Amino acid sequence: MTEVMELNDADRALKARHRAIWAMGDYDAVATQVIPALGPVLVDGTGINPGDRVLDVAAGSGNASLPAARAGARVVASDLTPELLDHGRQHAASEGLEIDWHEGDAEALPYEDGSFDVTMSLVGIMFAPHHQASADELVRVTRPGGRIGLISWTPEG
């Protein structure tokens, strides 16, 4: 096996562990207690307008996707963990919001270059193992002149 293959195998194993960890707890309950006010802050900060095509990366259960959809944006929510997306679908359905929910890896987003006016992540993408690869993907899928917005914490807190 080559070093590249070992790295890919290690990455796949790490992402599988991440997916399992996020799926085992009650992330949705924690998120609705800890970060509910941050979604509207991110939506306002990125200047999301009606009709904007928005990608929420590492969307979880939709803490930023839902306020973006309420603002009239066409939202795609992507996350590594399907169980979290299921919670988001339920929240969106209860409000009559249309959001496209897709399982996806922040380091290899399944979207064409320049597909989105706004790409954002609310306390999500920071958990991806390879930050540079994730940042490169955010830039790639955001149209030239588009906006990227993140809310994350730093190692210092």
Predicted regions and their residues:
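Class I SAM-dependent methyltransferase Rossmann-like catalytic core
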Residues: 25-30
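A short acidic, Gly/Pro-enriched loop at the edge of an enzyme's catalytic core
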Residues: 107-118
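Class I SAM-dependent methyltransferase SAM/SAH-binding core
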Residues: 53-108, 133
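A short glycine-rich, Lys/Arg-flanked "PGG" loop and its adjoining helix->strand segment in the class I
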Residues: 132-147
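A short SAM/SAH-binding and catalytic strip from SAM-dependent methyltransferases
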Residues: 117-131, 154
